[in-house]
């Protein structure tokens, strides 16, 4: 389960943050599930290393424009690409009418099956491997939080142990794998649980936006590996948060603490906290961390692979490190305005390029040896690179400046 943030701004896009969308990539089934689809989400997908053709399900939280205005464009482009056979869209009542109206009045015909599901609190989707549930949050219009839960996996079966005890091959091994007790013809009895490691706990991700603090978010997020929660406002703007039914940084942290999640990502920031303003997103992070220390800031294109063992993944730089924050600091320091956007794009292009490159390309274009290329590939396999600073820190011997020109 790999999360990529495609939009982390509330209401309107800023130069460095697009409006809401989060991609969940499920590598084992080559599928991407999107959560919200703000305007220009398809442009963000093109700038990421995700493949639009893998989008299989789209979950919409609510009908506000910053969460759905990119939906129709993306669905249309998926049709033109001709590589999609079915997309299922889930969302609140009126989403089906919105989609039907757009299709009708823009005379759009999709060459694939589009299934629109109106969700209600409870189970939304389940196929044995993954279950998606939702709860009604507390916003100005009906808004749903979603939880994706992966099923537990059976622990490893120690076949060599069974062989050593002389248990004959065949159906008995299947029964042992299932943890059942078997009796051999010679009268010996074995408990299958003695031959299997404990089951691997399935992972979970919860997405709560838009909402003011509410109990249903706490219930939905119980013990989740990752909670992505909106933090539109800083703590000192709590009055605004209550008036507009959005969350402050401290409300998000309280949900995380009450739900005992492992990791909290703050997202959906008001543009008033953009670089150069008196209060910035780093201040929201500090407020949240005072309540829930394991909090990080989401930023566009930030990638996080949820580890299987329930540990916090240490591969990603912490959100307040220079590497992760470099887009924001760039923007705060560079002039003129046009140069800022170009510089931010160019600065992180190498990270995107290296996430796509083959080993041969790396060796040729960067002039590095096979050992270094393999080390980079191995690191990439564990965790995609999110910014140039991370690459520079890990592999200072490589001249990264050539990458964005060459790939
Ligand atoms: Zn919103
Ligand atoms: Zn909203």
Swiss-Prot record:
List, in alphabetical order, the Gene Ontology terms for molecular function in this entry: 3'-tRNA processing endoribonuclease activity; zinc ion binding
Name the needed cofactors: Zn(2+)
- Identify the keywords attached in UniProt to this record, alphabetized: Endonuclease, Hydrolase, Metal-binding, Nuclease, tRNA processing, Zinc
The UniProt record gives the binding positions of Zn(2+) 1 as: 62, 64, 139, 210
Which EC number(s) are documented for this chain?
Answer: 3.1.26.11
Residues of the active site are: 66
- Note the InterPro entries from the entry: Metallo-B-lactamas, RibonucZ/Hydroxyglut_hydro, RNase_Z/BN, RuvA_2-like
Q: Does the keyword S-adenosyl-L-methionine apply?
A: no
Q: Does the keyword rRNA-binding apply?
A: no
Q: Which Pfam families match?
A: Lactamase_B_2
Unknown as annotated region, ranges: 309-407
Recorded catalytic activity of this chain's protein = Endonucleolytic cleavage of RNA, removing extra 3' nucleotides from tRNA precursor, generating 3' termini of tRNAs. A 3'-hydroxy group is left at the tRNA terminus and a 5'-phosphoryl group is left at the trailer molecule
Where, by residue number, does Zn(2+) 2 bind?
66-67, 210, 268
Against CDD domains, the record matches this protein to:
RNaseZ_ZiPD-like_MBL-fold
Q: NCBIfam families attached here? A: PRK00055.1-3, RNase_Z
Per its database record, what is this protein's job? Zinc phosphodiesterase, which displays some tRNA 3'-processing endonuclease activity. Probably involved in tRNA maturation, by removing a 3'-trailer from precursor tRNA.
Q: How does the record describe its quaternary structure?
A: Homodimer.
Name the record gives this protein: Ribonuclease Z
Species whose genome carries this gene: Thermosynechococcus vestitus (strain NIES-2133 / IAM M-273 / BP-1)
């Amino acid at each position: 389960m790999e999360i990529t943030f495609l939009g982390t701004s509330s209401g309107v896009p800023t130069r460095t943050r697009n409006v809401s969308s989060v991609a969940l990539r499920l590598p084992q089934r080559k599928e991407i599930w999107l959560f919200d689809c703000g305007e220009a989400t398809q442009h963000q997908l093109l700038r990421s290393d995700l493949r639009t053709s893998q989008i299989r399900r789209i979950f919409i939280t609510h009908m506000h424009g910053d969460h759905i205005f990119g939906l129709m464009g993306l669905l249309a482009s998926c049709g033109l690409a001709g590589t999609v056979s079915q997309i299922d869209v889930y969302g609140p009542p009126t989403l089906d009418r919105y989609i039907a109206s757009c299709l009708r009045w823009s005379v759009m015909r999709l060459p694939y099956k589009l299934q629109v599901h109106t969700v209600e609190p409870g189970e939304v989707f389940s196929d044995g491997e993954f279950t998606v549930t939702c709860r009604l949050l507390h916003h100005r219009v009906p808004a749903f939080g979603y939880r994706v839960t992966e099923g537990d996996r059976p622990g490893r079966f120690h076949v060599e142990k069974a062989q050593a005890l002389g248990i004959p091959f065949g159906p008995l091994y299947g029964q042992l794998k299932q943890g059942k007790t078997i009796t051999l013809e010679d009268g010996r009895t074995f408990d299958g649980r003695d031959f299997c490691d404990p089951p691997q706990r399935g992972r979970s991700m919860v997405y709560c936006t838009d909402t003011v603090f509410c109990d249903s978010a706490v219930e939905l997020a119980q013990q989740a590996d990752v909670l992505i929660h909106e933090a539109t406002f800083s703590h000192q703007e709590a009055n605004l948060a209550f008036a507009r039914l959005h969350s402050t940084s401290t409300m998000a942290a309280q949900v995380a603490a009450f739900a005992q999640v492992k990791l909290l990502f703050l997202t959906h920031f008001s543009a008033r906290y953009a670089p150069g303003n008196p209060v910035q997103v780093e201040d929201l992070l500090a407020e949240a961390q005072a309540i829930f220390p394991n909090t990080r800031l989401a930023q566009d294109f930030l990638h996080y692979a949820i580890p299987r063992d329930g540990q916090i993944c240490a591969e990603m730089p912490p959100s307040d490190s220079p590497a992760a924050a470099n887009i924001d600091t760039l923007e705060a320091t560079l002039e003129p305005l046009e140069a800022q956007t170009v510089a931010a794009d160019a600065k992180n292009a190498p990270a995107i390029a290296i996430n796509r490159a083959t080993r041969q390309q790396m060796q040729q274009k960067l002039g590095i040896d096979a050992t270094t290329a393999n080390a980079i590939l191995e690191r990439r396999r564990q965790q995609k690179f999110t910014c140039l600073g991370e690459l520079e820190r890990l592999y200072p011997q490589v001249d990264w400046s050539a990458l964005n020109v060459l790939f």
